[in-house]
Regions:
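Repeated scaffold domains used in trafficking and secretory/extracellular systems
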Residues: 81-89, 127-139, 166-178, 207-219, ...
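Hydrophobic beta-strand positions that form the internal "hydrophobic ladder"
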Residues: 95-96, 142-143, 180, 227, ...
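Beta-strand-rich domains and repeat architectures in extracellular enzymes and scaffolds
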Residues: 76-108, 129
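Short aromatic-glycine-(Arg/Gly/Cys) micro-motifs in beta-strand/loop hairpins
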Residues: 8-34
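A short beta-strand motif characteristic of beta-propeller blades
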Residues: 70-80, 118-125, 159-165, 197-210, ...
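Blade-level signature of beta-propeller repeat domains, shared across WD40, Kelch, NHL, RCC1
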Residues: 338-366
């Protein structure tokens, strides 16, 4: 393992390399200092600790030659409250959005970052608002925000914020092309961001899971032809957005559905469960039944790459990639600089990871 970090203000470099039980550290290309350990595991932990120390001081790791599963980028964006670690990426470029809470909830900052870790744009969301989720509509250059269960749109052209819904007791958010899906006044709404018109509404009643949490989760397919929503603990509804025909999938009552995503070919629907199994379920949309051959352990987050047909799943410090054409695992790798949780999003060439340590990273896919 070898890491080279750069302070972009002073142009100073710092590198660390592990070889078995030995660790070698050098600054600004100078002679390396050697440090020995009893076990390779101890040496690896020391490398992580020292690397993290430099990241917190403003150094950035950028290695575009990284192999599959290796970090292309590490950048520390802050040690305060990381909140829900929202990410939004466009799969046609390697830029992505992340958000960070400043101080004691004084404001939230939203960063548009490139694959070198440079902040191309910084936007402020004033007031004590917590961003739960973000979705980018590239067609209209609007970053949709779910802040405190209120949906708003941040225009990248003029920086103005438009509120689309009032603050609600629960929320959901999805984007496909110029269409956005959210919850407003007891109804699911599909809104055309290009024409500023409502395409579809469906009144729903959100059931309480366990008597404490409202069950609400909805998503559009990648091409916008399908919508899935879950407002009851025992079923998921699939809507054909052309014919408005509805079909129902029966699901286990012992888990709350917190997130959903269609496969790029609309063959599968993946659902992330909470409180029950905490697993990633997979449903066959041809038979409207669960896939018996699909089994994952407890997961914390997942993401799908539409162009490459990849699925990334995070649990217990590791990410597993799956090929959605074969439904088979490909590579697995450890996430660096994470405590328990992280969020995932795919750019064109990389997997973005935002950890609860406040570290934003890119990992190579091939």
């Amino acid at each position: 393992m070898e890491r080279t970090l750069t302070d972009r203000i002073t142009n100073k470099t710092w590198s660390i390399r592990q070889s078995g039980n030995q660790v070698y550290i050098a600054s600004n290309g100078g002679k390396a200092k050697e440090k020995g350990f009893d076990e390779p595991e101890q040496a690896a932990k020391y490398v992580q600790k020292e690397t993290w120390s430099r990241l917190k001081k403003g150094f950035v790791l950028h290695n575009p030659q990284a192999g599959a599963g290796q970090p292309v980028l590490h950048r520390y964006i802050g040690g305060g409250y990381t909140g829900f670690m929202p990410l939004a990426a466009t799969q046609d470029t390697n830029t992505f959005f992340s958000s960070y809470v400043i101080g004691q909830f004084e404001k939230a900052e939203i960063y548009l970052m490139d694959d070198q870790g440079e902040k191309q744009t910084t936007c402020e969301l004033p007031g004590k608002q917590l961003i739960f989720d973000m979705r980018y509509c590239a067609a209209q250059k609007i970053l949709l925000l779910n802040a405190d269960h209120q949906i708003a749109g941040l225009s990248l052209d003029n920086g103005e914020i438009e509120r689309y819904t009032p603050m609600m007791p629960t929320s959901t958010l999805s984007v496909s092309g110029s269409s956005a899906l959210w919850y407003d006044k007891s109804s699911l709404v599909v809104y055309d961001l290009r024409t500023n018109t409502v395409r579809y509404t469906r009144q729903v009643e959100c059931e309480k899971y366990g008597g404490h949490s409202l069950q609400l989760c909805a998503v559009l397919s990648h091409d916008g032809r399908l919508m899935a929503y879950c407002t009851r603990t025992d079923e998921i509804v699939i809507v054909n957005m052309t014919t408005m025909q509805e079909r129902t999938i029966a699901k286990d009552k012992n888990a709350m559905t917190s997130s959903m995503a269609f496969s790029p070919d609309d063959r599968w629907l993946f659902t992330q469960e909470q409180y029950g199994s905490w697993s990633l379920k997979c449903y066959d949309l041809n038979t409207m039944t669960g896939c018996r051959d699909w089994i994952t352990p407890e997961i914390k987050s997942f993401a799908i790459h539409e162009r490459r047909g990849l699925l990334a799943v995070y649990n217990y410090g590791k990410i597993q990639l799956f090929d959605l054409h074969t439904m088979k695992p490909t590579i697995a790798f450890e996430v660096e600089h994470v405590v328990k949780n992280c969020t995932l999003a795919f750019t064109k060439d990389y997997l973005v990871v935002y950890t609860d340590y406040g570290c934003v990273s890119l990992y190579a896919l091939a």
